[in-house]
Swiss-Prot record:
<feature type="binding site">
    <location>
        <position position="301"/>
    </location>
    <ligand>
        <name>substrate</name>
    </ligand>
</feature>
<feature type="site" description="Cleavage; by autolysis">
    <location>
        <begin position="214"/>
        <end position="215"/>
    </location>
</feature>
<dbReference type="GO" id="GO:0006592">
    <property type="term" value="P:ornithine biosynthetic process"/>
</dbReference>
<feature type="site" description="Involved in the stabilization of negative charge on the oxyanion by the formation of the oxyanion hole">
    <location>
        <position position="137"/>
    </location>
</feature>
<feature type="binding site">
    <location>
        <position position="436"/>
    </location>
    <ligand>
        <name>substrate</name>
    </ligand>
</feature>
<dbReference type="InterPro" id="IPR016117">
    <property type="entry name" value="ArgJ-like_dom_sf"/>
</dbReference>
<dbReference type="InterPro" id="IPR002813">
    <property type="entry name" value="Arg_biosynth_ArgJ"/>
</dbReference>
<dbReference type="InterPro" id="IPR042195">
    <property type="entry name" value="ArgJ_beta_C"/>
</dbReference>
<keyword id="KW-0068">Autocatalytic cleavage</keyword>
<dbReference type="GO" id="GO:0005759">
    <property type="term" value="C:mitochondrial matrix"/>
</dbReference>
<comment type="pathway">
    <text>Amino-acid biosynthesis; L-arginine biosynthesis; N(2)-acetyl-L-ornithine from L-glutamate: step 1/4.</text>
</comment>
<dbReference type="GO" id="GO:0006526">
    <property type="term" value="P:L-arginine biosynthetic process"/>
</dbReference>
<feature type="binding site">
    <location>
        <position position="215"/>
    </location>
    <ligand>
        <name>substrate</name>
    </ligand>
</feature>
<comment type="pathway">
    <text>Amino-acid biosynthesis; L-arginine biosynthesis; L-ornithine and N-acetyl-L-glutamate from L-glutamate and N(2)-acetyl-L-ornithine (cyclic): step 1/1.</text>
</comment>
<feature type="binding site">
    <location>
        <position position="441"/>
    </location>
    <ligand>
        <name>substrate</name>
    </ligand>
</feature>
<feature type="site" description="Involved in the stabilization of negative charge on the oxyanion by the formation of the oxyanion hole">
    <location>
        <position position="136"/>
    </location>
</feature>
<keyword id="KW-0511">Multifunctional enzyme</keyword>
Length: 441
């Protein structure tokens, strides 16, 4: 087999991504244990089943989630929503997740399979109606429940649950499909009162990513006590500014889910919407979520660039976000970025067809568009359009240098207000087609 230079370069980037973005250690919240196993659902024998359990009994846990708005909601999405609605987010003590099969568009039998996964874990932890379920993989196939059931039992019966770094990294690996690296982030924060707490998050995703009021597959857990109503608002706010601001290919999955559990293992007052620390926690969770969401884009299927689309000075935040999303989802913009072509006309085109809530957010006579270098090289900003006027003397050599960077920024200044929004996206390469052309095989 003749290996092309392009293929060799792609392999090098995959290795670099793993070494760059996968941690070698972490700090993890009190009162949780996680376990994972290769149940046999994945043909390659990789980890494909994971369980997270809250072991803290000092106070009841709380949970929140944000789900896909795709009309073909998968069985695990519908089942988890039902659990959260019936419990009002209180007393959720476990998450069970599988990869390799999405259990989507599988009818009533798929619903029964999702419920069976929940029931198996509930029985093992001795707490009814206490588990959420998540699945990812190929759509339209039923779960191999003989393997899933045996795998869940093995995790519990063989004492495969732990709170060490390897256990957390492995459960992050267990939700991967076309991912080239597991997404695991952990961090310790300090509140205004000096109390410290820990947050850990995992996500999977490299393709079928353009969430809307939800996001791919991921979960956060913390040892901070947070009331369920406050937790839902914190997670929604954070998601709207992180996972709802990423795009790889413009496709929204049937299974997109982000959930968060707060077990209150840290001895401090419960965070409510009226707490002095509420806004601080909301900000900390949001910045944490951005870090994790950006890892998904950095692992975009076949991608070679990480691109920040920064829309400034809009009349409203919503319109800034709509414009940033329109640019990020444009196939023509993404392919131009891959080809290192400074085709600013495609950017303006994507801005022009954005479905704005307030048309006054866009004034074609005042808009400016630039490429921004992120490697501290000068000139850092290369103006393409200024006050609605194309810059006919654009330095093509400098444009090529910026577009050759692994990280770069597209800056749009609307000059119609004071609101801003960011989206994170990647380019679209030949490799993306190769990966998705034979995904089921």
């Amino acid at each position: 087999m003749k290996i092309s230079k392009t293929l060799l370069q792609h392999g090098r980037k995959v290795i670099d991504k793993y070494n760059l973005y996968v941690p070698t250690e972490g700090v993890f919240p009190k009162g949780y244990k996680v376990g994972s196993i290769a149940s046999g659902v994945k043909k390659n024998g990789n980890l494909d089943l994971g369980v997270l359990v809250n072991t803290n009994t000092s106070r009841p846990s709380s949970a929140a989630a944000v789900f896909t708005t795709n009309k073909f909601k998968a069985a695990p999405v519908l089942t988890s929503k039902k659990v959260l609605e019936s419990t009002q987010g209180n007393g959720i003590n476990a998450i069970v997740v599988n990869s390799g099969c999405a259990n989507a568009v599988t009818g009533e039998l798929g619903m029964q399979d999702a419920q069976e996964m929940i029931d198996l874990v509930n029985r093992k932890i001795g707490k009814p109606n206490s588990t959420l379920v998540m699945s990812t993989g190929v759509i339209g196939q039923r779960l191999q429940m003989d393997k899933i059931s045996a795998g869940i039992k093995n995790i519990f019966d063989n004492n495969a649950l732990g709170n060490d770094f390897k256990s957390w990294l492995n459960i992050a690996k267990s939700i991967n499909t076309t991912d080239t690296f597991p997404k695991l982030v952990s961090r310790q924060f300090e509140l205004l009162n000096g109390q410290k707490y820990t947050l850990v998050g995992m996500a999977k995703g490299a393709g079928m990513i353009c969430p809307n009021m939800a996001t791919l597959l991921g979960y956060f857990v913390t040892d901070l006590p947070i009331a369920s109503s406050a937790l839902q608002k914190i997670l929604r706010f954070a998601t709207d500014r992180s996972f709802n601001c990423i795009s790889v290919d413009g496709d929204m999955s049937t299974n997109d889910t982000i959930c968060m559990i707060a077990n209150g293992a840290v001895e401090t007052d419960e965070i409510t919407e009226s707490s002095e620390e509420y806004e601080q926690v909301k900000s900390q969770v949001t910045e944490f979520a951005k870090t994790l969401a950006q890892l998904v884009v950095r692992d975009g299927e076949g991608s070679t660039k990480f691109v920040t689309v920064n829309v400034q000075n809009s009349l409203t935040f919503e319109d800034a976000k709509i414009i940033a999303e329109s640019i990020s989802n444009s196939m023509l913009v993404k392919t131009a970025l891959y080809g290192q072509d400074a085709n600013w006309g495609r950017i303006l085109c994507a801005i022009g067809y954005a479905k704005l809530d307030n048309l006054k957010s866009l004034n074609t006579d005042s808009i400016s568009v630039s490429f921004i270098a992120t490697d501290n090289s000068e000139p850092r900003e290369l103006k393409l359009v200024e006050n609605g006027v194309p810059q006919l003397d654009v330095d093509e050599e400098r444009a090529a240098q910026i577009l050759a960077l692994d990280d770069l920024e597209v800056l749009v200044d609307l000059k119609t207000g004071n609101e801003s929004a960011q989206f994170w996206t990647c380019d679209l390469s030949h490799e993306y087609v190769t990966i998705n052309g034979d995904y089921r095989s």
